[in-house]
Structures are given as structure tokens and as C-alpha cells.
């Protein structure tokens, strides 16, 4: 599932997670 809380999407910000959104210091991973 995609998280749309922040953009851009599809950043691998959480090692191994393929669908993450980064917003400042916050990372949202599906």
C-alpha cells in the first residue's frame, strides 16, 4: 500500500523498505 502523508514517495529511507515517504525528519513506510 502506498502512503500519501508526505512526498516524494518511493524513497528507500528505511533500509529494505521499498515504499517510503519522507517528510522532513519523518519517514512513513508502507
Curated annotation (Swiss-Prot):
Tissue spec. comment: Expressed by the venom gland.
Domain of life: Eukaryota
Main location, first listed in the record: secreted
InterPro entries: Toxin_34 (IPR013605)
Subcellular location: Secreted
Presence of the UniProt keyword DNA damage in the record: no
Residue ranges of coiled coil: none
Bilayer-crossing regions: none
Single GO term (MF): toxin activity
Pfam family, one: Toxin_34
Gene Ontology cellular component terms for the protein in this record: extracellular region
Key words of the record: Disulfide bond, Knottin, Neurotoxin, Secreted, Toxin
Keyword Disulfide bond appears in the UniProt entry: yes
Cysteine pairs bridged by disulfides in the record: 6-23, 13-29
Notes concerning its domains: The presence of a 'disulfide through disulfide knot' structurally defines this protein as a knottin.
Family per record: Belongs to the neurotoxin 04 (omega-agtx) family. 02 (Tx1) subfamily.
Function field: Lethal neurotoxin. Causes spastic paralysis and death in mice in 4-6 minutes after intracerebroventricular injection at dose levels of 1.5 ug per mouse.
Protein known as: U5-ctenitoxin-Pk1b
Originating species: Phoneutria keyserlingi (Brazilian wandering spider)
Amino acid at each position: 500500500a502506498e502512503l500519501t502523508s508526505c512526498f516524494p514517495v518511493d524513497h528507500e529511507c528505511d533500509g529494505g523498505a521499498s515504499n517510503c515517504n519522507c517528510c522532513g525528519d519523518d519517514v512513513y513506510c508502507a
